[in-house]
């Protein structure tokens, strides 16, 4: 991250930290924190939505958006094959709608982030009493990367997050439907659909220890475990889907950075031990449900 990016990044992060303390103070005095959270999300939308040329996604999507047809041209088939086949249908249709409304790429990018912010608003309000703190953690941990480098994947993940309530309520159809919508933006939503049975199970401490051990062995011996998953997808999901997922994950799972010891890897390992093996010592809330725990286990495996 160069200086032109890092200075605004850390300034925005400092503002969020101050707003977290405001939220804590309001909570301690039994005041509502909704508007502090709305203000924080407003700043998040401005900061990320107006990022301009920053991030790899601009290089990927800018020219693609210029080639996107209006709705009339799309209906008549007046568009290039490359534009249509590069990305998933949901993202393509969103581009068509934006182009029909006369949006520039920068307006399209801002509206895209605005929609993500609305999803975050409802998700955090539903899941936690400390929404500004959750937004800060989201921004530091993965949020900036999502919206600057993985625009379509952000939609997929956010829709998955929203679908978790259907896992808790055992509403399989609604869960699958929402993630199928996510799949129209990023094919990796197929993993979330397949993960439904895993999200429902209750893992014992012995099983959690085995998972930790296996993941550490994969990490230490640099085992490219995604091959096992892709073999199944070639068989049951078709070569096209498997090829897409391999393309998306090759820079994550196969990359050397996946196997390097970094701050994220250390923090995730520490959090895993803290949540599952020493919750009383670290005063981890006992109200965390199995679905949330299982999501973290899956994240631990993939990170």
Each predicted region: which residue ranges?
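Membrane-interface alpha helices of multi-pass inner-membrane proteins
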Residues: 143, 174-198
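Transmembrane-helix signature of polytopic, membrane-embedded enzymes
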Residues: 31, 124-140
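Membrane-interface transmembrane helices that cradle and orient dolichyl/undecaprenyl
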Residues: 160-174
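Short hydrophobic/aromatic helix or loop-helix immediately within or flanking a transmembrane segment
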Residues: 59-67, 74-75, 79-103
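Short acidic/glycine- and proline-prone juxtamembrane loop motifs at membrane-interface regions
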Residues: 148-154
